[in-house]
């Protein structure tokens, strides 16, 4: 019972700090250290400069300041391990521990950074006294962005990896131009504290992720992929273990009455589509990242744009996500490609795409529905002039003339297909 109380108390403190981290004062920084279980002490360096030292098992941070932290002079980080190249700088070469304390009104960014360092410290498998290291998460975090960028580039996917943006620790994936943020790759506590987390490194020659030593591991953490928006993923492509959205909404295709009069939609979905944005990945499954990113592109470039083009211009009430009145998927089911074996890059699996930011599936779901009287007017449409569209989660047909396939076509072909559909609907 006491453990549960302590966990609840810690959660309440964390939420309070996230909500209102406090202004940048020396007492507030010291209190923040106390809530995170860190030691702190102040030394007078000279008549005008003081130093606040913050220490944990591995991390030591020295903050030099003047006048009770009115002016931050410098922030330095030292690790009590053999790794001395930990990256706490942004792409401009700025020290983010310093920038998260300088010219800011509150401790929000610094609290995030300090909490992240405590996380890496707590879950690194390092014996300081003997010098033996099984898994140094400070090194892993430093190396991860380049490994991800090399892997994505080798898979010929148009994405850019960035690190330590906005004065906070973190790894993000952007579109090819580095303008639109697609997702973050985070390290978080796992629901199962006994779950092993093995170190996998990317071999650019073999173009694969390798676990070079079974001893290179820790416990109780996961990689987490977090998209910036909800994406419709086929339910049968995902195992329950990786899903973090507890009760995801189902995306239902619109009724025929919601579509333009010139469109006839045939539903060939073999799986429910779930609107999700977060996935818990064991490190041995990091090879799934290109599949997530490719599906994101398919979702954005093809699925969203097709629905945007075929939905009636005069829709007036919202398209429901419930089962009532919508065309139901056929009962054919695929087995999950993630269950009971390591995934292959040739498998069809859960993914996502980039681009066309102005129209999301959520926006489509929020579109209005035409009235019954308007629906009656459609009965007079010449059926022979309707454009037959067959939609499956992995392919779309426009009659017998055009096909767009997730598996068999590249991104250029997807865009050409959308251009063709636009020309037919003008």
Curated annotation (Swiss-Prot):
<feature type="region of interest" description="Disordered">
    <location>
        <begin position="319"/>
        <end position="349"/>
    </location>
</feature>
<keyword id="KW-0805">Transcription regulation</keyword>
<comment type="similarity">
    <text>Belongs to the Mediator complex subunit 1 family.</text>
</comment>
<comment type="function">
    <text>Component of the Mediator complex, a coactivator involved in the regulated transcription of nearly all RNA polymerase II-dependent genes. Mediator functions as a bridge to convey information from gene-specific regulatory proteins to the basal RNA polymerase II transcription machinery. Mediator is recruited to promoters by direct interactions with regulatory proteins and serves as a scaffold for the assembly of a functional preinitiation complex with RNA polymerase II and the general transcription factors.</text>
</comment>
<comment type="subunit">
    <text>Component of the Mediator complex.</text>
</comment>
<protein>
    <recommendedName>
        <fullName>Mediator of RNA polymerase II transcription subunit 1</fullName>
    </recommendedName>
</protein>
<dbReference type="Pfam" id="PF10744">
    <property type="entry name" value="Med1"/>
</dbReference>
<keyword id="KW-0539">Nucleus</keyword>
<keyword id="KW-0804">Transcription</keyword>
<dbReference type="InterPro" id="IPR019680">
    <property type="entry name" value="Mediator_Med1"/>
</dbReference>
<dbReference type="GO" id="GO:0016592">
    <property type="term" value="C:mediator complex"/>
</dbReference>
<dbReference type="GO" id="GO:0045944">
    <property type="term" value="P:positive regulation of transcription by RNA polymerase II"/>
</dbReference>
<dbReference type="GO" id="GO:0003712">
    <property type="term" value="F:transcription coregulator activity"/>
</dbReference>
<keyword id="KW-0010">Activator</keyword>
<feature type="compositionally biased region" description="Polar residues">
    <location>
        <begin position="336"/>
        <end position="347"/>
    </location>
</feature>
């Amino acid at each position: 019972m006491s453990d549960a109380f302590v966990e609840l108390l810690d959660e309440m403190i964390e939420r309070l700090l996230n909500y209102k981290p406090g202004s940048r004062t020396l007492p507030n920084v010291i209190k923040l250290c106390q809530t995170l279980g860190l030691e702190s002490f102040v030394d007078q360096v000279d008549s005008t400069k003081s130093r606040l030292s913050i220490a944990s098992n591995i991390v030591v941070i020295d903050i030099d300041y003047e006048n009770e932290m009115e002016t931050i002079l410098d922030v330095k980080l030292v690790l009590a391990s053999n790794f001395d190249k930990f990256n706490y700088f942004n792409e401009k070469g700025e020290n983010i521990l310093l920038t998260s304390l300088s010219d800011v009104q509150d401790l929000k960014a610094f609290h995030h950074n300090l909490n992240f360092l405590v996380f890496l410290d707590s879950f690194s498998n390092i014996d300081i006294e003997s010098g033996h290291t099984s898994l140094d998460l400070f090194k892993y975090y430093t190396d991860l962005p380049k490994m991800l960028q090399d892997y994505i580039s080798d898979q010929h996917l148009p994405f850019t990896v960035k690190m330590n943006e906005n004065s906070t620790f973190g790894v993000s994936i952007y579109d090819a131009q580095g303008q639109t943020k697609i997702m973050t790759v985070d390290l978080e506590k796992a629901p199962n504290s006994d779950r092993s987390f093995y170190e996998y490194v990317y071999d650019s020659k073999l173009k694969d992720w390798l676990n070079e030593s079974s001893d290179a591991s820790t416990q109780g953490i996961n990689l987490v992929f977090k998209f910036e928006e909800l994406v419709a993923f086929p339910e049968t492509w995902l195992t329950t273990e990786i899903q973090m959205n507890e009760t995801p909404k189902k995306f239902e295709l619109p009724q025929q009455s919601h579509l333009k009069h010139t469109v006839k939609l045939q539903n060939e979905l073999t799986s429910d589509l779930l609107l999700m944005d977060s996935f818990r990945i064991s490190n041995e499954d990091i090879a799934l990242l290109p599949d997530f990113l490719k599906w994101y592109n398919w979702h954005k470039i093809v699925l969203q744009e097709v629905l945007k083009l075929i939905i009636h211009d005069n829709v007036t009430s919202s398209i429901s996500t419930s089962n009532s009145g919508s065309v139901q998927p056929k009962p054919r089911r695929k087995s999950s490609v993630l269950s009971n074996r390591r995934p292959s890059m040739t498998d069809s699996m859960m993914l996502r795409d980039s681009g066309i930011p102005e129209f999301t599936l959520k926006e489509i779901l929020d579109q209005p529905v035409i009235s019954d009287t308007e629906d009656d007017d459609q009965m007079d449409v010449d059926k022979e002039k309707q454009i037959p569209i067959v939609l499956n989660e992995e392919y779309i047909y426009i009659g017998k003339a055009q096909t767009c396939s997730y598996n068999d076509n590249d991104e250029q072909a997807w865009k050409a297909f959308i251009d063709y559909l636009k020309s037919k609907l003008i």
